[in-house]
Curated annotation (Swiss-Prot):
This is Single-stranded DNA-binding protein. Homotetramer. Signal peptide: none annotated. Gene3D superfamilies: Nucleic acid-binding proteins.
Length: 164
């Protein structure tokens, strides 16, 4: 293989409102905590079990930070695409620590609100090919959706059925 791939795709719910902070030169950084869950039936008891995994997500893309700040709230369902990165840092007592995070930065990052604004549809935000590096706007995604303008309930045909 000529190269390698570092791509993470998550669909989950925000565990808390996004934390927005700014660099010294004023650029925003958004931190998200996303929960993904899997459920199964225990073979012995027949009892339904669930395991939740928590993921740290850091957004360095200014446009995506604005979307996170304005529209994302605790409990919101999101689809994200980013890269897995591990960083090393030293805590206050001098102990070296490591954090592994999903990073949304640059061109290969996507943030899609699956709940939509106001409950209907969803909105997709990411880097448009050939666009400005820091800009972000609605882009087409696999299930083509426009940014929701608000209102409306969930579509009944959007259940868990796969269209093929």
């Amino acid at each position: 293989m000529a190269g390698s791939v570092n791509k993470v795709i998550l669909v989950g719910n925000l565990g808390k409102d996004p934390e927005i902070r700014r660099t010294q030169d004023g650029r925003p950084i958004a931190n998200l905590s996303i929960a993904t869950s899997e459920t199964w039936r225990d073979k012995n008891s027949g009892e339904r079990k669930e395991k939740t995994e928590w993921h740290r997500v850091v957004i360095f893309n200014e446009g995506l930070c604005k979307v996170a700040e304005q529209y994302l709230k605790k409990g919101a369902k999101v689809y994200i695409e980013g890269a897995l990165q591990t960083r090393k840092w030293t805590d206050q007592s001098g102990v070296e620590k490591y954090s592994t995070e999903v990073v949304l930065q640059g061109f290969n990052s996507t943030l899609t609100m699956l709940d939509g604004r106001g409950g209907g549809g969803g909105g997709s935000f990411g880097e448009e090919p050939g666009g400005d590096f820091g800009s972000s706007g609605p882009v087409s995604s696999a299930p083509r959706r426009a940014v929701a303008a608000g209102g409306g309930g969930r579509n009944s045909d959007m259940d868990d059925d796969i269209p093929f």
